[in-house]
Amino acid sequence: MNLSNHFLVAMPDMEDAFFSQSVVYICKHDEDGALGIAINKPSPITMDMIFSATGKNIPMRMQHDSVMMGGPVQVERGYVVHTPIGNWQSSIGVSDNIALTSSRDVIENISREGAVDKALISIGYSSWGKGQLERELADNAWLTVPADEHILFDIPYEHRYAAAFAKLGIDPLALFSGAGHA
């Protein structure tokens, strides 16, 4: 099972302080573990802080976007999920059209016409060790659904959890993650 380019959707009863009601975009998943970016947890960092650090202006299309808290790992670093993939210093391709980049050059070029069409900027990332995500899935902590660029880039962050459940065709209020016993 490879969940790259999928959303992890937290079960409604997840009690983890960070991951409760989260949607995580899985950027890499292999036998060694998984790496993803939470796409619906705003950070205290502003777009102005990000772009002023590079000496660039915030692109008009991103004026009202929030910087996400991508996860509890390496919160001092920035990460950008974006289209198109492009040619950046430190990127991993997630799909044919989406990449995760951790190098500053993507931010420095984000306002240049045609360099980056859509972007989600985060600080930190989410990570699972070997077999950890598979155990959490077996324990019914998460639901999975193929990623949707509209949810990832176009829907306001506060509506992404509901949108992911809608894509699954599930009412989150009807779910119970505990195993049933007869």
From Swiss-Prot:
What are the GO cellular component annotations?
cytosol
What InterPro entries does this protein map onto?
Answer: AlgH-like (IPR003774)
Q: List the Gene3D superfamilies.
A: VC0467-like
HAMAP family (UniProt xref): UPF0301
- Which PANTHER family is this protein grouped with? UNCHARACTERIZED PROTEIN YQGE (PTHR30327), UPF0301 PROTEIN YQGE (PTHR30327:SF1)
Checking Pfam families in the record gives: DUF179 (PF02622)
Q: What is this protein called?
A: UPF0301 protein NMC1274
Q: Which family does it belong to?
A: Belongs to the UPF0301 (AlgH) family.
What SUPFAM superfamilies does this protein map onto? VC0467-like
